Design a protein with these regions (language model features):
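Metal- or metallocofactor-binding catalytic centers and their adjacent structured scaffolds
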Residues: 245-290
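C-terminal helical "lid" subdomain and adjoining coupling/linker elements of P-loop NTPases
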Residues: 184-187, 191, 203-257, 302
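Basic, low-complexity terminal or inter-domain segments flanking catalytic cores
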Residues: 2-5, 91, 174, 212, ...
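Intrinsically disordered, low-complexity regulatory segments
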Residues: 1-171, 247, 251, 479, ...
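Amphipathic alpha-helical transducer elements in NTP-driven molecular machines
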Residues: 11-18, 35-42, 61, 77-88, ...
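C-terminal or mid-to-C-terminal helical accessory/interaction module adjacent to the motor/catalytic core
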Residues: 138-223, 280
Length: 856
């Protein structure tokens, strides 16, 4: 008897499928029934294999471009290798005669599955399971509507094409730019990519507008008028104003001359006014249902959540709790045949026990009672549903959500309810008061019927202006006229919310109508990838977070200058993404051959590499700074060029990116002034390892790294007088001070050293502030520090630094949360295990010495 192998994308999905279909027995990491074998991937198991990374040295132009005749696959990591062995064995079982692709419905899910089958080298009939919800009913219904492999082939072709094109541009572009930047020695990794670089360009261009912005003074005139019923205010405006596209700072209420503004004040003071008033009804519909990008924007604006955090929370609500539909969607509409399911969902939310959604129960009950769920193109529209529909609650009610999960669920549930509520109704009043030939405008907006705004309470209503009444033909008196001097403001920096909007609407920056239409559906990246793109730019040091703002680094300015100077405009313009999305859509619709698309990508790759390889200028043209700090060697003027800060009067110069870390201009100024800077993180050794160091300008005016581990220097007497002690040494009780890259006991330096205590100011890329060292010395433990990076796995981790019994500094980790046990004995075991784990962690904490990764 033959069986069908089902491959899901994640173990949790495989478990849900086994429960929905029933009859399965678990066999280790897979399930089996009379008819099916059920296993899963763990996300992306395979990726396109890159050429060997350099161990020492640098990427060069010698082997570029890299355009393989065929793309090889390799496991992503060791864990992937083990899972692949299982899947290959199951795929090659003789009793497995067919395969069902149950990976996530979309391009990436298709790619994950196709790579696994390709790697296994099997050819068996394939069918496609297209899941839009993880409820058992939805899973069973999807199994009754399996799609054939021929139908899915265009999506598979588009998925492969996207992956291979991204690989070609990313690998070759990154290595070409890295080779160019590493010509003078060292290894300056310069990542570029089809989506990440245009995204970075958007932020860089905004920052340039902010940097070059010059504030302009302007004036407004505000007046207070007396009517029989009371006071009201108005603002002067020019009724003849015409918007000037070349000067967007112009407004009908702005006066650019103080003299002209004062003339209006003088003319209107104490004068009578005539009133003209128009009052009209206004309706405000609720926003559309959430797709992933709009949900990420809302969560960032309301709670400060990063796009990555929101995606993780929404994914957990979909997979683990099963209370939301598939989150990685770019549609804000529902299929027309889901009206009945939506009614049922609304009835669930209206029930007596709606779990986390209980506060919304009265609103859901109103929708049910009024029968507001009915066909409506604002909500149900097949033409606007892509692979997946909008994010909405499922028939399963939420229980035991974390605070963050509950916030995201409530956002979605409220939006879901609001689209079925009537529009909010306002009474909008515009009053024009004419005084001495001048016009003043007063506007009021009064909420008449809250409609959907009732679901949000006061959150969405704001402060409505209730205007005092003015009788017909009543004259008012000008009681007070105020002149306000103001200044124009620069554009706001991007937050994740506004950058997501810019990425989504990047098609507006494209001139070609067909490409703009292609990008109107996806923009830069997809809802599923935008969070990772932003995180990637942060991790590569191109962006940094300050509060909620995203600020480009000096490394970004360096990259923008390079790409502009080399003429590689394909990587900075969203038109490249627009063109690709247009063609990938054509592939999905069988309107374009995959091989034709890949030929075009190969040609583009060759052009990008050629421009970087053949550029023969000494520098790259750009907008460079002149430093205010004089040359430390001769006192001359120091100017920036593409590669260095160089004196215009002598031979002094320093690299702009020692150890692969780009100087901020302010850092260069400090280094020249004080001849010392740091400790700084973000350097990369020739072995590709991150390290921290102090930078110094030597007596010979050369730039040097100081790792704080020079025994010769420590053998000299050190004068700590005038310095503040951070606390007592945990080994000998003497005072601990800051000294170079370390915190040291005063008795651990000098010719008569008697103590060995020292602890790095940077440990595994985590900066240890003086405040935290004081806390460690006084209390025995720091606060929880969140930016350690493992030298083995290169992953971030959190830990406390603790004072050990031998006086050394070690790690202590947060105890892992244990799951609530069903039985009392289980709970006791879990508690015992937790206590033992914590005890072991304290006992076996490894010394946390600073990493010294010298560049020789």
């Amino acid at each position: 008897m033959t069986k069908t192998l089902i491959i899901a994308e994640k173990p949790s999905v495989a478990l849900d499928i086994s429960r929905a279909l029933g009859g399965f027995t678990r066999k280790g990491d897979y399930f089996e029934s009379d008819d099916f074998v059920l296993a899963s991937s763990i996300g992306h198991l395979l990726s396109l294999v890159a050429p060997n990374d350099p161990v020492r040295g640098k990427w060069s132009f010698t082997h570029l471009p890299v355009i393989p005749p065929q793309f090889d696959l390799g496991p992503v990591d060791k864990r992937s290798t083990e899972r692949l062995k299982l899947l290959v064995r199951l795929l090659k079982r003789k009793d497995v005669s067919a395969i069902i692709n149950a990976c996530d419905a979309g391009r990436e899910g298709e790619l994950i599955f196709r790579y696994i089958v390709q790697y296994a080298g099997v050819k068996k009939p394939i069918q496609r399971l297209w899941l839009r919800s993880m409820t058992r009913t939805a899973i069973r219904e999807a199994f009754e509507q399996l799609r054939d492999d021929e139908t899915m082939q265009p999506l598979a072709d588009a998925a492969r094409s996207r992956a291979e094109a991204d690989w070609l541009i990313g690998i070759n572009g990154t290595r070409a730019m890295t080779a160019f930047n590493s010509k003078d020695g060292g290894f300056f990794k310069t990542p570029v990519g089809r989506v990440q670089t245009p995204t970075l360009t958007i932020v860089a261009e905004r920052e340039e507008r902010i940097r070059s912005f010059v504030a302009r003074d302007y004036w407004e005139v505000h007046a207070t008028f007396v009517a029989a019923a009371g006071l009201y205010e108005g603002r002067w405006f020019d009724p003849a104003f015409v918007r000037n596209e070349s000067d967007p700072e112009q407004r009908d209420s702005r006066l650019w001359s103080e003299t002209a503004a004062r003339t209006i004040v003088t003319a209107c003071e104490g004068q009578p006014g005539e009133v003209e008033e128009e009052s009209r009804p206004s309706r405000q519909m609720s926003p559309a249902l959430f797709d992933l990008t709009s949900l990420q924007r809302e969560a960032n604006s309301r709670f400060g959540y990063s796009a990555k955090t929101t995606l993780s929370l929404a994914q957990a609500l979909y997979e683990r709790h099963k209370v939301l539909t598939y989150p990685r969607t770019d549609s804000r509409y529902l299929p027309e045949d889901t009206v009945a399911v939506v009614r049922e969902t609304m009835q669930q939310l209206a029930g007596a026990d709606a779990g986390t959604a209980t506060p919304l129960q009265p609103f859901a009950a109103t929708v049910v009672e009024q029968q507001w769920v009915k066909p409506n193109r604002r909500i149900f529209d097949n033409r606007k549903v892509s692979d997946h529909f909008a994010i909405i609650p499922t028939l399963q009610l939420p229980k035991e959500l974390s605070e963050a999960e509950a916030r995201i669920y409530t956002l979605v549930a409220r939006r879901f309810l609001s689209v079925f509520f009537p529009a909010a109704e306002f009474r909008v009043t515009t009053r024009i008061t004419r005084v001495a030939g001048h016009h003043f405008k007063t506007e009021g907006k009064v909420l008449v019927e809250p409609g959907w705004l009732a679901i949000y309470g006061r959150e969405a209503q704001g402060e409505d202006a209730h205007l005092v009444a003015v009788a017909p033909d009543e004259h008012v008196r000008t009681e007070d006229v105020e002149l306000r001097g103001l200044q124009t403001r620069p554009p706001a920096r991007f937050t994740e919310a506004t950058l997501l909007s810019a990425m989504e609407g990047a098609g507006k920056l494209v001139d070609d109508e067909a490409l703009r239409e292609a990008m109107s559906e996806r923009g830069l990246g997809t809802p599923a990838t935008r969070a990772a793109i932003i995180e990637g730019l942060l991790n590569e040091g191109y962006l940094r977070r300050e509060g909620r703002e995203l600020i480009p680094s000096a490394k970004t300015r360096q990259l923008m200058t390079l790409l502009s100077g080399l003429g590689v405009n394909e990587l900075t313009s969203p038109e490249l993404t627009g063109e690709w999305e247009h063609k990938l859509k054509q592939i999905e619709q069988r309107e374009l051959d995959r091989s034709s698309f890949m030929r075009d990508i190969a040609q583009m790759t060759q052009v990008i590499v050629k421009r970087a390889k053949e550029y023969d200028g000494d520098t790259v043209p750009g907008d460079y700074a002149t430093l205010t700090t004089p040359c430390p060697k001769c006192g001359g003027v120091v100017k920036e060029n593409y590669r260095r800060y160089a004196c215009t009067n002598c031979d002094f110069s320093i690299s702009k990116y020692p150890g692969g870390r780009t100087f901020e201009t302010a850092e260069a100024e400090t280094l020249l002034e004080k001849r010392e800077l740091g400790p700084l993180t973000g350097f990369i050794s020739k072995q590709g390892r991150p390290f921290a160091a102090v930078l110094r300008i030597s007596d010979e005016h050369k730039l040097e790294f100081d790792f704080g581990q020079n025994d010769d220097a420590d053998s000299e007497a050190v004068d700590f007088s005038g310095k503040e002690s951070l606390g007592p040494c945990p080994k000998c009780g003497a005072a601990v001070y800051e000294h170079g890259m370390n915190y040291v006991c005063e008795k651990s330096v000098g010719p008569e050293r008697s103590c060995t205590f020292r602890s790095g100011k940077v440990i595994l890329q985590q900066e240890i502030s003086a405040e935290q060292m004081r806390k460690l010395l006084a209390e025995g433990r720091t606060d929880l520090l969140t930016d350690f990076v493992s030298s083995r796995t290169h992953r971030k981790f959190k830990a406390f630094l603790v004072r050990q019994s031998d006086g050394k500094v070690g790690f202590e980790f947060e105890p892992r949360a244990t799951k609530t046990a069903a039985k009392k004995t289980g709970a006791k075991k879990a508690a015992a295990k937790k206590a033992a784990t914590k005890k072991t962690a304290r006992k076996k904490a490894a010394p946390a010495e600073s990493e010294a990764d010298v560049l020789d």
